[in-house]
């Protein structure tokens, strides 16, 4: 018996454009911007457009079909929004357990912790340090996402005052951390309208925390350390109570319980994605900073290292939100790069727009080079050109986001494509010479390019780090 026959919701791998098309108005009205309803259905299945772009579907006539489609397209992991406005962070929203099955959405959010017992100067310094963390990686700005304000004092007024200070200094979304409902309510009186994540409800305080979540319309974390059965029970109770936006914390144990931590995260995500367990179909929160609670007596650098590798483990073990204590660049950078790589869409390579780029102040005698539009290749070449302070033109050829050697082998980079790109770029009107420097890994195309373009081809270095030396030794416009 198939999964459809037993009544399970259609999975993303089983869902076809026909399934969606059958429930659309099928009028080909083009209000969605597509030529016909089938084209729109295809984009909906690929999650390229929301179903709400079909305006007729939102009318009373198609209300039943709209509800069916929303249920059909509902992700296995509910998407929860923390914060408001431009800085709002979406967590969850996963359709599959493993990225290669489709793709991942909403990269793991990273929050840095603050406490209500920090001196004002230290608080401001820590906020600025985290907020200023930025790193450009293949054209993307990698940064942190949130702050987690912890009540270590247990004093409602202190907690409230600290949150006010934090909100004065940053617009990042907040996680408010306390198991005491009175402390939490004090914080929510200040931050409630910014939709913070309430951390957390447990078996002792769930009712009070649920009331606060409903009152302030905020998402709520559910905490049941190393007890999935209790976690499900709490989720069921909270859903029945009316709280819909939940985030699950099954506990993070950095030492003896590390295996349990990874197993729990995996079992929860598997239950939701593979077996349709809706009680576990919520974002997961990991707290690598627990290493600081269990590491008394150990050197600070050792604890930072432990927290860093634990964060990396949880990123690849389905965590949708992490709370960290370490804010050092060396500890954060590996994980934001790991996160970016994990959340890259495997269905399409990371690419840049093809076309002509200028570096420095090139003139009619400046070198002309070309590379592919694979993002990693382009930004590596661009970085080496800039560091070498070279005034030149760089032609970016469309290879569908594939690197030079692979593009040549797969016929995505051909002499014909280079000739076409040269013609379309208008470079012939910008320089007097007719010399083109090509990547060393595209050397086999040199003869064909010369025949098709009439340009003299210079075979450049195999690695872009050699460009400055190559220009210095080999380049002459005459």
Question: Language-model segments: what does each one mean?
Answer:
Residues 3-16, 42-72:
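Non-heme iron-sulfur electron-transfer modules
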Residues 1-8, 29, 279:
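A broadly conserved sequence feature marking short terminus-proximal activation segments
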Residues 25-43, 52-56:
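Local cysteine-cluster metal-coordination motifs and their immediate loop/turn environment
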Residues 6-7, 23-25, 218-219:
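Short beta-alpha connecting loops at secondary-structure transitions
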Residues 11-26, 62-127, 354-361, 478:
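N-terminal amphipathic alpha-helix/helix-capping segment at the start of soluble metabolic enzymes
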Residues 3, 46, 109-239, 244-441, ...:
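Conserved mixed alpha/beta catalytic, RNA-binding, or beta-rich assembly cores of soluble enzyme
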């Amino acid at each position: 018996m198939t999964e459809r026959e037993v009544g399970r919701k259609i999975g993303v791998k089983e869902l076809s454009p026909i399934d969606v098309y059958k429930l659309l108005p099928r009028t080909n009205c083009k209000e969605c911007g597509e030529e016909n309803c089938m084209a729109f259905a295809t984009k909906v299945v690929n999650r390229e457009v929301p179903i709400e772009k079909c305006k007729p579907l939102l009318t009373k006539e198609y209300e039943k079909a709209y509800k069916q489609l929303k249920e059909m397209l509902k992700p296995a992991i509910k998407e929860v929004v923390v914060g408001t406005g431009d800085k709002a962070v979406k967590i969850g929203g996963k359709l599959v357990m493993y990225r290669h099955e489709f793709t991942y959405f909403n990269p793991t959010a990273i929050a840095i912790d603050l406490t209500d017992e920090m001196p004002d100067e230290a608080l401001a310094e820590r906020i600025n340090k985290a907020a200023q963390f930025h790193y450009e990686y293949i054209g993307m700005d990698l940064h942190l996402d949130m702050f987690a304000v912890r009540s270590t004092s247990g004093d409602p007024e202190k907690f409230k005052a600290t949150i006010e200070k934090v909100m004065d200094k940053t617009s990042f979304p907040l996680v408010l951390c306390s198991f005491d409902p009175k402390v939490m309510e004090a914080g929510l009186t200040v931050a409630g309208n910014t939709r913070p994540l309430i951390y957390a409800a447990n078996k002792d305080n769930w009712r009070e925390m649920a009331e606060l979540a409903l009152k302030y319309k905020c998402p709520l974390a559910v905490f049941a350390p190393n007890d999935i059965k209790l976690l499900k029970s709490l989720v069921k109770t909270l859903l029945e109570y009316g709280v819909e936006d939940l985030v699950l914390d099954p506990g993070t144990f950095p030492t003896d319980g590390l295996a349990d931590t990874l197993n729990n995260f995996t079992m929860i995500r598997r239950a939701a994605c593979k077996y349709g367990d809706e009680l576990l179909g919520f974002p997961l929160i990991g707290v690598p900073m627990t290493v600081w609670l269990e590491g008394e007596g150990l050197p600070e650098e050792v604890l930072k290292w432990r927290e860093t590798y634990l964060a990396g483990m949880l990123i690849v073990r389905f965590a949708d939100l992490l709370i960290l204590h370490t804010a050092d660049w060396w500890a954060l950078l590996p994980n934001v790069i790991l996160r970016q790589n994990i959340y890259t869409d495997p269905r399409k390579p990371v690419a840049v727009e093809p076309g002509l780029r200028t570096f420095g102040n090139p003139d009619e005698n400046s070198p002309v080079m070309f590379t592919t539009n694979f993002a990693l290749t382009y930004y590596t070449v661009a970085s080496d050109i800039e560091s070498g302070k070279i005034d030149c033109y760089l032609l970016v050829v469309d290879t569908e986001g594939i690197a030079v050697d692979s593009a040549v082998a797969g016929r995505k980079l051909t002499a014909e494509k280079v000739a076409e790109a040269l013609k379309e770029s208008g470079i012939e009107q910008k320089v007097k010479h007719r010399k083109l420097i090509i990547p060393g890994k595209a050397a086999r195309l040199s003869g064909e390019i010369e025949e098709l373009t009439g340009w003299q081809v210079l075979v450049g270095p195999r690695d872009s780090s050699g460009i400055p030396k190559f220009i210095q030794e080999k380049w002459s416009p005459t």
